[in-house]
């Protein structure tokens, strides 16, 4: 599995700001969007382009355009919604597929509860977004669902990943690509990433 920890100074700076314990909902939400945008820039760097001639201000001009990529952005509910706008800044024509998976706080197992996928998903590359890759269970369940519906190409974008989650994802889905702003130290006994960001969903939505 391809794992990319994006080490651009802007990303490192912004993810550092997100670690502040008493960060406001507004600021956390803004930073999640910004880091999601920067991760998308990195994740789409291998998209092929083709030459197209358009009518410019002074006659025909040849330009580069993305070549035939159909994209679906897949936020995992609910926290993934906090990264979605940042992704759409770069691929505004992408279709949105929504998958609902929550983690049982006692068993730490993923529990799927909702999905609404884009049409022709078998022809699309999926940019799957979720702020945290902790145990990997929610991401694995989402990728299982996408594959069951015919999707074949995946790029996973997360703000912070734990080594345990990376290992689990690689074992279950070695064909995906993972882009993360940070690989943290470990999971604690409750399955939270250390040092992590805290509960990203609560911080994005202002709930507890």
Swiss-Prot record:
This protein's UniProt keywords: Allosteric enzyme, Glycosyltransferase, GTP-binding, Magnesium, Nucleotide-binding, Transferase
Catalyzed reactions per annotation: UMP + diphosphate = 5-phospho-alpha-D-ribose 1-diphosphate + uracil
Top EC category: transferase
Sites where the protein binds uracil: 193, 198-200
Origin: domain of life: Bacteria
Disulphide linkage map: none
Protein's GO biological process: UMP salvage; uracil salvage
Note on how the cofactor is bound: Binds 1 Mg(2+) ion per subunit. The magnesium is bound as Mg-PRPP.
Pathway: Pyrimidine metabolism; UMP biosynthesis via salvage pathway; UMP from uracil: step 1/1
Residues binding 5-phospho-alpha-D-ribose 1-diphosphate: 78, 103, 130-138, 199
MF (Gene Ontology): GTP binding; magnesium ion binding; uracil phosphoribosyltransferase activity
Coiled-coil intervals, chain numbering: none
Pfam families: UPRTase (PF14681)
Regulation: Allosterically activated by GTP.
Family stated for the protein in its record: Belongs to the UPRTase family.
Primary role: Catalyzes the conversion of uracil and 5-phospho-alpha-D-ribose 1-diphosphate (PRPP) to UMP and diphosphate.
Protein name: Uracil phosphoribosyltransferase
Organism (species): Photobacterium profundum (strain SS9)
Gene: upp
């Amino acid at each position: 599995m391809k794992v990319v920890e994006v080490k651009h100074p802007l990303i490192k700076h912004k993810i550092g700001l997100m670690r502040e314990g008493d960060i406001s909902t507004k600021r956390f939400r803004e930073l999640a969007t910004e880091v999601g945008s920067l991760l998308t820039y990195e994740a789409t760097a291998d998209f092929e382009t083709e030459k197209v001639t358009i009518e410019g201000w002074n006659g025909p001009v040849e330009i580069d355009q993305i070549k035939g990529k159909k994209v679906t952005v897949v936020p995992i509910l609910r926290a993934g919604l906090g990264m979605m706008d940042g992704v759409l800044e770069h691929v505004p024509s992408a279709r949105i597929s929504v998958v609902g998976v929550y983690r049982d706080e006692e068993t730490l197992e993923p529990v799927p509860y909702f999905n609404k996928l884009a049409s022709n998903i078998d022809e699309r590359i999926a940019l799957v977004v979720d702020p945290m890759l902790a145990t990997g269970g929610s991401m694995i369940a989402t990728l299982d669902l996408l594959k069951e519906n015919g999707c074949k190409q995946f790029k996973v974008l997360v703000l912070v990943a734990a080594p345990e989650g990376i290992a689990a994802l690689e074992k279950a889905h070695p064909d995906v690509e993972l882009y993360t702003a940070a690989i943290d130290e470990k999971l604690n006994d409750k399955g939270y990433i250390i040092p992590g960001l805290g509960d990203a969903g609560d911080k994005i939505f202002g709930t507890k």
